Amino acid sequence: MDRAAVAKMGAVASASVCALVGGVVLAQYIFTMKKKTGRKTKIIEMMPEFQKKTVHIKDPGRVEEIICGLIKGGAAKLQIITDFDMTLSRFSYNGKRCPTCHNIIDNSKLITEECRKKLLQLKETYYAIEIDPALTIEEKYPYMVEWYNKSHALLIEQGLQKDKLAEVVRESDVMLKEGYENFFDKLSEHNIPVFIFSAGIGDILEEVIHQAGVYHSNVKVVSNFMDFDENGILKGFKGELIHVYNKHDGALKNTEYFKQLKDNSNIILLGDSQGDLSMADGVANVEHILKIGYLNDKVDELLEKYMDSYDIVLVKDESLEVANSILQKIL
């Protein structure tokens, strides 16, 4: 065989090898891309908390990208913005509904039976509207204002005593989510700002976390706070009403707080409603924001909507495991 023939055969063989190697590389790339667009990603694969059936993620690649950004930024850049009722507190325990901050008062001995019935009627009427998947936030908005104003008026009529609130919380069935000690203590240890933005009753909320031993100095609460007269009797509520669907306005009113945290451009947001998605609207310099949503009710009707708006959706999940696992990577 002459040299030209040998060279030709070598070229063909070389081309075949290149094609084969190229095919392997392409296959590897396609496999990697498929994996990235699938449910799991490298970081999430390493986190057993993400493998639970309660965890739903529409875009794992995006979640990995955000978590990588949070890890890179570390403690110095992080802040937490969170709802309270049914987000930090439990929705249910052993099949029984747990109370919200308002419910703690509604169910207490400070309220007459007649008032309790009226409050329950309001809840039955308006809660159905709050979680109705067929209504927009704009359509729900006036009903929420109506509900809160009527409920607060009934509470004012009862002449609630400030010095009884601690006892009322102690006697209630309120429970914080599993893993709350680790969540609050780790954030306190690293001095990470925690902004609790609640449409509940601030006095009750503060008492709950105080009694749980987690009301640390890094925690700021913005909520509906009671206004008491000189005798400690409820006479009204301070400031403008915060309800589940006007947190955007409230967030903008707290821009001074967020300005002080201008270097904390990475956010983990936790909520349980569509209204909670706007809690970070007062932050001007967001670099990375991871939105974690708890879906507690009407799962079949609302799951798709929640997955479209929250990065991670936790269905009927009564723990802070996922948030804690992310904090473990960052801090």
UniProtKB/Swiss-Prot annotation:
Function summary: Nucleotidase which shows specific activity towards cytidine monophosphate (CMP) and 7-methylguanosine monophosphate (m(7)GMP). CMP seems to be the preferred substrate.
GO CC field: cytoplasm; cytosol; endoplasmic reticulum; nuclear body
InterPro entries (UniProt xref): HAD-like_sf (IPR036412), HAD_sf (IPR023214), Pyrimidine_nucleotidase_eu (IPR006434)
Induction: By norepinephrine/NE and adenosine which are released by the embryo under hypoxic conditions. By stimulation of beta-adrenergic/adenosine receptors in definitive red blood cells (RBC).
KW Metal-binding (keyword) present: yes
One example of a Gene Ontology biological process annotation: CMP catabolic process
Protein name as annotated: Cytosolic 5'-nucleotidase 3A
UniProt xrefs under NCBIfam families: HAD-SF-IE
Gene3D superfamilies recorded: HAD superfamily/HAD-like (3.40.50.1000), Pyrimidine 5'-nucleotidase (UMPH-1), N-terminal domain (1.10.150.340)
Keyword Transmembrane part of the UniProt annotation: no
Keywords annotated in UniProt: Cytoplasm, Hydrolase, Magnesium, Metal-binding, Nucleotide metabolism, Nucleotide-binding, Transferase
PANTHER family associated with the record: 5'-NUCLEOTIDASE (PTHR13045), CYTOSOLIC 5'-NUCLEOTIDASE 3A (PTHR13045:SF14)
Binding site for N(7)-methyl-GMP: E130, S151
